[in-house]
């Protein structure tokens, strides 16, 4: 069960980082 928690933490952290970068600089891919 610990592996599942660590995996969830890792995915959530990467998601938050990606979210921050995505909103920090505007997406240039419009098409």
From Swiss-Prot:
Any single Gene Ontology cellular-component annotation: chloroplast thylakoid membrane
UniProt keyword list: Chloroplast, Membrane, Photosynthesis, Photosystem II, Plastid, Thylakoid, Transmembrane, Transmembrane helix
UniProt-listed GO biological process terms: photosynthesis
Pfam families: PsbT (PF01405)
Compartment(s) of residence: Plastid, Chloroplast thylakoid membrane
Domain of life: Eukaryota
Transmembrane parts of this sequence: 3-23
Topological relation to the membrane, as annotated: Single-pass membrane protein
SUBUNIT field: PSII is composed of 1 copy each of membrane proteins PsbA, PsbB, PsbC, PsbD, PsbE, PsbF, PsbH, PsbI, PsbJ, PsbK, PsbL, PsbM, PsbT, PsbY, PsbZ, Psb30/Ycf12, at least 3 peripheral proteins of the oxygen-evolving complex and a large number of cofactors. It forms dimeric complexes.
Function: Found at the monomer-monomer interface of the photosystem II (PS II) dimer, plays a role in assembly and dimerization of PSII. PSII is a light-driven water plastoquinone oxidoreductase, using light energy to abstract electrons from H(2)O, generating a proton gradient subsequently used for ATP formation.
Protein family according to the UniProt entry: Belongs to the PsbT family.
Name the UniProt record assigns to this protein: Photosystem II reaction center protein T
Organism of this sequence: Nephroselmis olivacea
Gene: psbT
